[in-house]
A protein has these predicted regions:
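A short helix->loop->beta-strand "cap" motif at the edges of active sites that frequently abuts
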Residues: 120-122
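Conserved glycine-rich Rossmann-like NAD(P)H-binding loop of the short-chain dehydrogenase/reductase
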Residues: 33-45
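N-terminal Rossmann NAD(P)H-binding glycine-rich loop of SDR-like oxidoreductase domains
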Residues: 9-31
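SDR active-site strand-loop-helix element
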Residues: 14, 38, 81-85, 124-129
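Rossmann-fold NAD(P)-dependent oxidoreductase module
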Residues: 23, 27, 116, 164
Length: 167
């Protein structure tokens, strides 16, 4: 194939200041994809390890702001959004004063990303967790398993995020 005609997939990654987003961006760079990172900070604020993610394009994005999500995803116009942004402090999610914030990020923010992806016909990769299950199963988990049983606010919020994406 003539290199002049090869297409470079553009991928927007949310939550690049976190471990998963950081690693996804570095993997995209290794594979030659065009990666654009996003996080709530106006500049990359994750691990300063000198890896590719520290110099790749990044945009500020509060995923709980539906208008901002639509604007950024429309402007970036990615082929794919890998949604790594989330409230991940599992134990703190149980605090009464944190529950609304957890839901705003993990459910409403995820819904905002899904809606914007649909509007620009971008694929969306959603990262969930095993916390959507209670850990009591005795058989290997199957990809289409619906035996959800979250035991925590965090687990419920990630399940609700999954359902938002699926719908």
């Amino acid at each position: 194939m003539n290199k002049a005609f090869q297409y470079c997939m553009k991928v927007l990654v949310t939550g690049v200041a976190g471990q998963l987003g950081h690693d996804v961006m570095n993997e995209l760079a290794k594979r030659g994809y065009e990666g654009v990172g996003s996080d709530i900070a106006p500049f990359y604020s994750g691990v300063a390890d000198g890896s590719a993610v520290t110099t790749m394009p990044s945009v500020a994005l509060d995923i709980t702001d539906a208008e901002a999500v639509t604007r950024i995803i429309t402007d970036v116009n990615p082929d794919v959004v890998v949604h790594c942004a989330a409230w991940t402090a599992v134990d703190l999610a149980e605090d009464e004063d944190k529950k609304d914030k957890v839901r705003a990020i993990n459910v409403d923010g995820t819904q905002n990303i899904a809606n914007a992806c649909k509007a620009v016909d971008a694929k969306m990769v959603y990262i969930s967790t095993d916390y959507v299950f209670d850990g009591q199963g005795e058989e290997p988990w199957m990809a289409d398993c619906k035996d959800y049983a979250p035991l925590s606010v965090y687990g419920q919020s990630k399940l609700d995020g999954e359902l938002a994406v699926a719908n």
